[in-house]
């Protein structure tokens, strides 16, 4: 089963993304901050990470760069709260299936 890291400080948004991905058969690990995301990357194996457009205490780009240094094999997808969830899920499915890169 492919694992996805979902990072979002807003629990309702994070949980909505997690449920949608779980519905497609993914194992989802949730992180409520950039610090938690870094910890989870050290502890797990992921094919992709979903980052929000806004983070407290750091930028999405800084976290993306850090994750890229720690685990370059992970595809990173940035998802804003106004973006369509079904497109995110399709993108993650395409990454899993080897059809697309982030």
Which stretches of residues belong to each language-model region?
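Two-component/phosphorelay signaling modules centered on CheY-like receiver
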Residues: 11-29
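Conserved acidic segment of CheY-like receiver
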Residues: 1-11, 17-18, 49
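A short, hydrophobic beta-strand element within the central beta-sheet of small alpha/beta folds
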Residues: 49, 64, 73-83
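Acidic, metal-coordinating helix/loop segments flanking the phosphotransfer/catalytic sites
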Residues: 32-48
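Conserved N-terminal glycine/acidic-rich loop preference
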Residues: 35, 54, 87-91
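Receiver (REC) domain switch/output surface
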Residues: 85-102
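Conserved phosphotransfer microenvironments
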Residues: 14, 47, 51-69
């Amino acid at each position: 089963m492919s694992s996805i890291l979902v990072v979002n400080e807003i629990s309702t948004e994070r949980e909505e993304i997690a449920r949608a991905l779980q519905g497609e058969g993914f194992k989802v690990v949730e992180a409520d901050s950039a610090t938690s995301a870094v910890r989870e990357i050290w502890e797990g194996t992921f094919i992709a990470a979903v980052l929000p457009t806004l983070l407290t205490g750091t930028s999405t780009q800084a976290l993306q760069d850090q994750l890229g240094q720690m685990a370059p094999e992970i595809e990173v997808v940035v998802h804003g709260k106004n973006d369509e969830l079904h497109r995110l899920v399709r993108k993650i499915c395409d990454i899993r299936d080897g059809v697309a890169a982030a």
